[in-house]
Design a protein with these regions (language model features):
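Alpha-helical scaffolding within the catalytic cores
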Residues: 76-82, 137-139, 196, 235-242
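Catalytic pocket-lining loop regions of alpha/beta-barrel enzymes
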Residues: 165-288
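Conserved, mostly hydrophobic/aromatic
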Residues: 52, 93, 126, 179, ...
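Active-site gating loops and adjacent loop-to-helix segments of metal-dependent hydrolytic enzymes
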Residues: 57-92, 146-163, 208-209, 216-221, ...
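Short, electropositive alpha-helical surface patch
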Residues: 103-119, 208-212, 270-280, 305-312
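Active-site neighborhood of phospho(di)ester-bond hydrolases with catalytic His/Asp-centered motifs
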Residues: 49-51, 96, 127, 154, ...
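Active-site gating/metal-coordination segments in enzymes
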Residues: 103-194, 200, 216, 232-233, ...
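Mid-to-C-terminal alpha-helical segments outside catalytic/metal-binding sites
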Residues: 2-4, 8-51, 60-84, 88, ...
Length: 337
């Protein structure tokens, strides 16, 4: 795996690898759900914003965590791959940072700037990696904001090197408050047993908009009578934590991440308890559809996830579904879409 820097690859090389490649692709009522997932139903909505899309070219970026990942995702994924995965869907995407090596934060930002400026892919905005507790966080934000595509920051909180309570340290809170001042969001991706920290974080930073990733990293197996493997938490502890978080008006929830822990043969009914609890708890104005592609491939294809979510939400009001599939992402992230 090569670790490039801005000094040894050109804009043209990057766009050839990512943006130009995309053109080649062109040659609450879960009881009544069907248990199979069909391949290509109609799109669930006339406009879809995927609020959580990953892209990584391992010739450009070093992702330490990917070295021990499942072979399904331990490879490069380009805009062309995403276009193929979303064929037939009226979808645009918000890039989500991919936990690159520490010395590549600015490089990732530059690559995304060039990709988005090319206007040749479905990706039109970005949530970038950042270190809120870093002394140079303000300068980093200025550099990223100058690129014009930044909507928010994420700093992974569930990696083994990050101790519990990191997001509540004084310097971290200072950085999060700065995001609020600059009208930028913070995506929270945290261990499910530490969700109560999100309540404190949101309380301490009331002027910052938070987006909780992946239904709080819920493990859908917790709701199965006989799961194939032990879930990461109990159903009740996750439910109570999510209810506490939802009381904070400055936290929204991404509806995603529920397919990944599932074993082969899952059905929409298996996912419905987690999805419906989030939709009901956060309300129709604070939920966002997200794919988590390509990480979702650990449990199913992007289209399978879209189809399942469409079935789970089919009985909800059309206005609520419009908010889920696109409108909320546009408003919460301040998107030009």
């Amino acid at each position: 795996m090569r670790n490039h820097s801005p000094t040894n690859i050109s804009r043209g090389d990057f766009l050839t690898t990512l943006a130009a490649a995309s053109a080649a692709v062109l040659s609450p009522a879960c009881k009544t759900l069907r248990t199979e997932v069909t391949s290509h139903p109609e799109a669930p909505h006339s406009r879809i914003i995927d609020a959580h899309q990953h892209l990584w070219d391992l010739e450009q970026l070093h992702l330490p965590w990917l070295q021990k990942a499942d072979p399904k995702i331990a490879k490069s994924f380009s805009p062309a791959d995403y276009r193929a995965a979303t064929e037939g869907l009226p979808i645009r995407a918000v890039y989500m940072e991919v936990a690159v090596a520490e010395d590549q934060l600015d490089w990732e930002a530059r690559l995304l700037q060039e990709l988005i400026q090319s206007q040749s892919t479905q990706t039109f905005a970005a949530i970038l990696s950042g270190r809120p507790a870093s002394p140079d966080f303000a300068d980093y934000l200025e550099r990223c904001m100058d690129k014009g595509m930044l909507k928010g920051i994420r700093r992974i909180l569930h990696d083994p090197e990050t101790p519990r309570g990191t997001c509540l340290e004084a310097d971290f809170l200072k950085g999060i408050r700065l995001l609020g001042e600059k009208k930028l969001t913070f995506d929270v991706c945290i261990r499910p047993r530490e969700l109560r920290d999100v309540v404190t974080l949101a309380t301490e930073c009331p002027d910052t908009q938070f987006v909780l990733d992946h239904c709080g990293n819920a493990d859908s197996k917790a709701f199965q009578a006989n799961p194939a493997a032990k879930p990461a938490h109990t159903a009740v502890e996750w439910q109570k934590s999510m209810e506490a978080i939802a009381k904070r008006p400055n936290v929204a929830c991404k509806i995603s991440g529920v397919v990944e822990p599932m074993s082969a043969g899952w059905t929409p009914e298996d996912l419905a308890p987690v999805v419906n609890h989030c939709l009901d708890t956060f309300g129709s104005d604070r939920v966002l559809f997200s794919s988590n592609w390509p990480v979702c491939l650990l449990g199913g294809t992007l289209r399978q996830w879209v189809d399942a979510l469409a079935k789970i939400t089919a009985s909800r009001p059309a206005t609520d579904r419009a908010k889920l599939w696109a409108d909320n992402a546009s408003r919460i992230y301040g998107l030009d879409a």
